[in-house]
């Protein structure tokens, strides 16, 4: 019948704050550190599902915002879920669309209620709030669901960064309530996202507030958006020191081989 996903989280080895771990999902086991190939719109570009498996990938990433636009949540749900739709029988993590607040910032409008996006394909307007973003991911059958967050651009003022972080925290509570009401906790898990820009103080505040919400896993968001590598490495190391120790960690947006290896090893003594 599948696993209760993060009750099976296990630390295999540690060195400083660097960790090797494994966890089970209803679609199989994931060993970390792990790289997630990006399958934004239910496909990893230029590769078939079999070719992806042949690379050794054990989990892939989808984007619920893009999938909700095309082909649509209902079609994917009616097809039997995202795994069936893309012919992938291993774990899938879906991002909520919060990063598009940053990447599509010229065409969207952000309020405390949610984000109004313009579709990159036809220019139509679409409003997404934390509840809908969470429901979309539940309905398409993602193994790991990400909270809806406000990822703000690098260089924003401290006041703007703090406002985006506070909004992220409020949205995280709404995502959690929605998941508790409609999610399948035996088969899916919800991760919170740490924000706070490049401010150590704000990062520590975000860590404290979101840790208290007791998500099944945590992501470090808002990095790899233009800051220096030394700043990114410093903030990842800071977050690693304070994230709940018995839970998985997801570093969002980082994918170069150099950064992957550096950030895995930077936490070692």
Which residue ranges define each predicted feature?
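Alpha-helix N-cap and loop-to-helix initiation/capping positions
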Residues: 125, 156-167, 198-205, 227-231, ...
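Glycine-enriched alpha-helix->loop->beta-strand junction motifs that scaffold or abut catalytic
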Residues: 56-57, 141-142, 210-218, 244-246, ...
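Charged helix-capping and loop-helix junction motifs
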Residues: 78, 207, 232-237
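Non-catalytic, usually N-terminal nucleic-acid engagement modules in DNA/RNA processing proteins
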Residues: 5-184
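Conserved radical SAM core fold
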Residues: 68, 149-157, 199, 216-227, ...
């Amino acid at each position: 019948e599948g696993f209760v996903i993060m009750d099976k989280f296990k630390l295999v080895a540690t060195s400083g704050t660097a960790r090797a771990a494994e966890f089970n999902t209803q679609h199989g086991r994931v060993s970390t550190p792990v790289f997630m190939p990006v399958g934004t719109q239910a496909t990893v570009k230029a590769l078939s599902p079999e070719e992806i498996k042949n690379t050794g990938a054990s989990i892939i990433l989808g984007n619920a915002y893009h999938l909700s636009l095309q082909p649509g949540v209902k079609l994917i749900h009616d097809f039997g879920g995202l795994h069936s739709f893309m012919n992938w029988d291993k774990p899938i993590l879906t991002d909520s669309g919060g990063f598009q607040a940053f990447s599509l910032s010229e065409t969207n409008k952000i309020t405390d209620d949610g984000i109004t996006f313009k579709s990159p394909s036809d220019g139509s307007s679409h409003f997404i709030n934390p509840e809908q973003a969470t429901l979309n991911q539940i309905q398409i059958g993602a193994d790991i669901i990400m909270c809806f967050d406000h990822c703000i651009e690098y260089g924003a003022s401290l006041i703007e960064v703090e406002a985006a972080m506070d909004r992220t925290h409020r949205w995280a509570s709404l995502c959690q309530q929605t998941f508790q009401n409609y999610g399948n906790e035996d088969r899916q898990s919800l991760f919170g996202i740490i924000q706070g820009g490049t401010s150590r103080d704000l990062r520590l505040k975000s860590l404290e507030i979101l840790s208290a919400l007791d998500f099944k896993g945590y992501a470090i968001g808002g990095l790899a958006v233009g800051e220096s590598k030394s700043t990114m490495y410093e903030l990842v190391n800071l977050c690693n020191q304070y994230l709940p120790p018995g839970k998985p960690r997801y570093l969002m947006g980082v994918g170069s081989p150099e950064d992957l290896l550096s950030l895995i090893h930077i936490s070692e003594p």
